[in-house]
Regions:
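Asp-box/WD-like beta-propeller blade repeats and closely related beta-sheet repeat scaffolds
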Residues: 1-22
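Alpha-helix capping at helix-to-loop junctions
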Residues: 22-25, 56-57
Length: 174
């Protein structure tokens, strides 16, 4: 895939979350929500519901991870571990460790339950194994009961020793 002027045209005002961070000197990571098109998160030909690795030198795009609903935060720690936070549907907000080629399951796997919207886009049904991630990458942590998760960071300093290497997530409310 090569980089167009606009990677994704707006298709919905819901579930279009995302974050952008610098991966290294040549690449950025861009997380993209499913824009109310849940089935596209598993479609390898589409960019919805993915974390994209974009090479800024040659303008190529590769799908880094897939199976995302509504990503909100990205953070790379000093060791190179990539953390992501993501809204679940009704509950099931996730903290994930992103690894190249991994699939986090949306919409076939979720720790949340189905939300009803007037315009829900592609319809999806709850997976047979609700509250599981069979055949998909499990989240590091799932909030069952939504916290409205947002940005994520890892505290890597020594000033507050009790918090060293702890993850912090922002919340839009309980």
């Amino acid at each position: 895939i090569t980089l167009p002027d606009c990677i994704i045209q707006k298709t919905s005002f819901l579930k279009n979350g995302g974050r952008i961070i610098e991966l290294d000197n040549e690449n950025i990571l861009l997380s993209v929500g499913d824009f109310l098109r849940p089935l596209l998160a598993q479609n390898k030909e589409r960019l919805f519901g993915k974390t994209l690795k974009i090479n800024v030198k040659n303008k190529s795009i590769n799908i880094f991870t897939s199976g995302h609903r509504n990503p909100q935060g990205l953070y790379i720690d000093k060791s190179g571990t990539i953390y992501a936070s993501e809204h679940g549907p009704r509950g099931g907000d996730e903290v994930n460790i992103l690894k190249d080629g991994s699939n986090y399951g949306w919409p076939q796997a979720s720790y949340g339950t189905q939300l009803k919207f007037a315009d829900q886009g592609d319809q999806w049904q709850l997976p047979h194994n609700i509250f599981g991630h069979d055949n998909f990458t499990e989240p590091l942590h799932a909030f069952v009961g939504s916290i409205g998760i947002s940005q994520i960071i890892k505290y890597e300093h020594a000033y507050f020793e009790n918090w060293k290497n702890d993850l912090f997530v922002a919340s839009m409310g309980f």
